[in-house]
Structure formats: structure tokens, C-alpha cells
Regions:
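Conserved beta-strand hairpin/beta-sheet module of binuclear metal-dependent hydrolase folds
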Residues: 1-43, 131-147, 164
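Structured catalytic core of nucleotide-sugar glycosyltransferases
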Residues: 5-15, 58-62, 66, 120
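Active-site environment of divalent metal-dependent phosphoester hydrolases
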Residues: 12, 60-63, 85-86, 128, ...
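Active-site neighborhood of phospho(di)ester-bond hydrolases with catalytic His/Asp-centered motifs
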Residues: 26-30, 50-58, 78-81, 143-146, ...
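Active-site metal-binding motif and surrounding structural segment of the metallo-beta-lactamase
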Residues: 33-80
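Metal-dependent catalytic neighborhoods of phosphoester/phosphodiester hydrolases
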Residues: 64-73, 88-91, 226-233
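Metallo-beta-lactamase
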Residues: 81-132, 136-139
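Cap/insert and terminal regions of metallo-dependent hydrolase folds
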Residues: 153-251
């Protein structure tokens, strides 16, 4: 049985868990190590069940605890060479990943990590480098796309073959435009290497979701420029106008910024 948990999704910290009875992948590690230990305990899980870590990019809200968990548990950390370079230079990562645990991935090349087949793919974002991950386990395909400025053809392909999808819905353009952020930050967020809006997320689903898609989680919502109900309502409306009925075609939920999700069982 494949299971999924979110321990945090947003600028305050991102961390996701994909696991079976005998193997466990952590995707990003931007939640504090004390909070992680508490979350694992609350779910009746052990931190040492994690066998490998995947990192999407080197911004602090995705990596601040990766050196600690890797060093304490002797965990390999997989990401691109450029992201690893960014990690080694990131002052927010106080404890660096020891060289013996540094593992490189190549975009577009599938690798086997424990029980999982993992394919990293490029994601446009203004970090040193950025990737999403598509993970296959016993015929189930789970894909995570976060911190994404725009949808590329490659990203569209992975959406189209996914059964379970975590995808960014960061902001509502009108709230961003009217909000308190300085102009340069608004332009960064809304730019081609920034973050997906609710509308851009909805468009990606309309254009690429297949009948195989069962469940979608919206991730990395802005606290200032979005709201869970607004994101879900906006995306549901766009989907409905295109003939896609939530609950009939697939399920849609929002991952909370600071509160862990429920534990989801991902069925074939």
C-alpha cells in the first residue's frame, strides 16, 4: 500500500512523505527538525523509516533541515548537481549535507530508489535549479510540481500520465496586484520563473488531466495572496466550465501551510 502525507506546504516550510510498509521517500525538508519529530510521533511513525530524500530546489523553505536529517539518519539526498551546489552555499542550511550522502539526478532520466522508480523533470523557477518528481510504484504514478513559473511541455506530459498529483496554486492575481508586496516581488511571483496562479493551475489541469487522474492536491498557497477556499473555488469553477466535475472526474483538496494533512492511501 502506497501512502502520502504532507507535513507543511508553503513559504513557512515544505515537506512531503511517500511511503509503503517497507520503504519511505521524503520530498523536500523545509520543516524544522523538532516539528518533524513531533509530526512523525503524532502519526505513530518513526523518523528512521525514511530511507531517502528528494529535493526540488535550494530555497530555504524546502531545505532548511535536510542536512540535519541526512546526517542524523545517514540518508542519501537526491537532487541535481546545481541544486546540491546551491545547498552547499545556502546560509539558511546551517548543517550541510555531508558529501558521502550527496546523490545526483539527471532531468528526464528515471532512476530506481529503493522500491520506487523516480523521474526528475525540469521546473521553471528562480532558484539555482528546480525539479519536480514523478514517482512510480506498482503501477501507481504520483507527481509533485511546486514552485513553478509556468507549465512546460514536459510538465504537461507528467500531469497527463499521473494518477495522483500535487500541483502549485500559489496566488490569485487580483489579490497579488492589490496586496502590500513591492512591485519587484509581485513581478517575480507572477513572472515565468515565479509561481503558478490559481488560474494557471486550473488551465494545466483542464489541458492535461487524463481519465487516469484520481486525486489532486493544491500546494504552496500564499498566505498573503491566496486562501484555501478561494483557490479551490476558482479552480473548480474553471474545471466546471470545461466540463470537468470535481468528485466525478477526480478529487481536489488543498494542502495546508502549517498543519499536516491526513494520511492518504493511494490505490491503483
Amino acid at each position: 500500500m502506497l501512502r502520502f502525507l504532507s507535513f507543511g506546504s508553503g513559504s513557512s516550510g515544505n515537506c512531503y512523505l511517500l511511503y509503503t510498509d517497507t520503504d519511505c521517500l521524503m520530498i523536500d525538508c523545509g520543516v524544522g527538525i523538532r516539528s518533524l519529530k513531533k509530526h512523525f510521533h503524532n502519526y505513530g511513525l518513526q523518523l528512521n523509516m525514511v530511507h531517502n530524500v528528494l529535493i526540488t530546489h535550494d530555497h530555504a523553505d524546502h531545505v532548511k533541515s535536510v542536512g540535519s536529517i541526512s546526517g542524523d539518519l545517514q540518508l542519501p539526498v537526491y537532487t541535481t548537481e546545481d541544486v546540491h551546489r546551491g545547498l552547499s552555499q545556502n546560509w539558511c542550511v546551517r548543517r550541510k549535507v555531508d558529501q558521502q550522502y550527496v546523490k545526483f539526478v539527471q532531468k528526464g532520466e528515471e532512476i530506481t530508489i529503493g522500491e520506487f522508480k523516480v523521474t526528475p523533470f525540469g521546473v521553471p523557477h528562480d532558484s539555482t535549479d528546480c525539479v519536480g518528481y514523478s514517482v512510480e510504484y506498482e503501477g501507481i504514478r504520483f507527481t509533485l510540481i511546486t514552485d513553478c513559473g509556468h507549465i512546460t511541455d514536459e510538465i504537461a506530459l507528467f500531469i497527463s500520465i499521473s494518477n495522483y498529483l500535487v500541483i502549485e496554486a500559489n496566488h490569485e492575481p487580483e489579490k497579488l496586484a492589490a496586496g502590500p508586496y513591492p512591485r519587484h516581488l509581485k513581478e517575480r511571483i507572477s513572472g515565468p520563473n515565479g509561481h503558478l496562479s490559481n488560474e494557471a493551475c486550473a488551465k494545466a489541469l483542464v489541458e492535461n488531466a487524463s481519465p487516469a487522474l484520481r486525486h489532486v492536491w493544491l500546494c504552496h498557497l500564499s498566505d498573503e495572496n491566496n486562501h484555501p477556499e478561494l483557490a479551490k473555488k476558482t479552480i473548480e469553477a474553471v474545471l466546471r466550465d470545461s466540463g470537468i466535475i470535481i468528485g466525478k472526474e477526480f478529487t481536489l483538496e488543498v494542502l495546508k501551510r502549517k498543519i499536516p494533512s491526513e494520511m492518504y492511501e493511494l490505490n491503483p
